[in-house]
Amino acid sequence: MQIDEKLLSKLEKLSALQITKNRNETIAQLSEIVNFVKKLNELDLDSQEITVSTIKGGAPLRIDEIRNSNVIDEVLDCAPKKQEHFFIVPKIIE
């Protein structure tokens, strides 16, 4: 897959994001990521055992701690359009 200006513009539209700085650098980084994933697809993993966790017995449990957090507000503050606690995005499916 070739990452170019046309594809980057399409990704911007679908994701409702704007990439304004260093577009050429962004294209180069996306191309590197795609090439890395292609290399991962070439790995022969048929002889490898399927694992869910690298820790024997599973991951240790942790104590849940309740914390006040404004993560929702912080994320929504970055959105170009929002209403209450939701993102407003353009309709892409008819």
Curated annotation (Swiss-Prot):
Q: What is its EC number?
A: 6.3.5.-
Q: Which residues form each disulfide bond in the chain?
A: none
What parts of the sequence cross the membrane?
Answer: none
Parts forming coiled coils: none
Keywords, A to Z, come to: ATP-binding, Ligase, Nucleotide-binding, Protein biosynthesis
Q: Which reaction does it catalyse?
A: L-glutamyl-tRNA(Gln) + L-glutamine + ATP + H2O = L-glutaminyl-tRNA(Gln) + L-glutamate + ADP + phosphate + H(+); L-aspartyl-tRNA(Asn) + L-glutamine + ATP + H2O = L-asparaginyl-tRNA(Asn) + L-glutamate + ADP + phosphate + 2 H(+)
Query: What Pfam families does the entry give?
Result: GatC
Q: Name one GO biological process term.
A: translation
According to its UniProt entry, the function of this protein is described as: Allows the formation of correctly charged Asn-tRNA(Asn) or Gln-tRNA(Gln) through the transamidation of misacylated Asp-tRNA(Asn) or Glu-tRNA(Gln) in organisms which lack either or both of asparaginyl-tRNA or glutaminyl-tRNA synthetases. The reaction takes place in the presence of glutamine and ATP through an activated phospho-Asp-tRNA(Asn) or phospho-Glu-tRNA(Gln).
Q: How does it assemble?
A: Heterotrimer of A, B and C subunits.
**Protein known as:** Aspartyl/glutamyl-tRNA(Asn/Gln) amidotransferase subunit C
Record the organism.
Answer: Campylobacter jejuni subsp. doylei (strain ATCC BAA-1458 / RM4099 / 269.97)
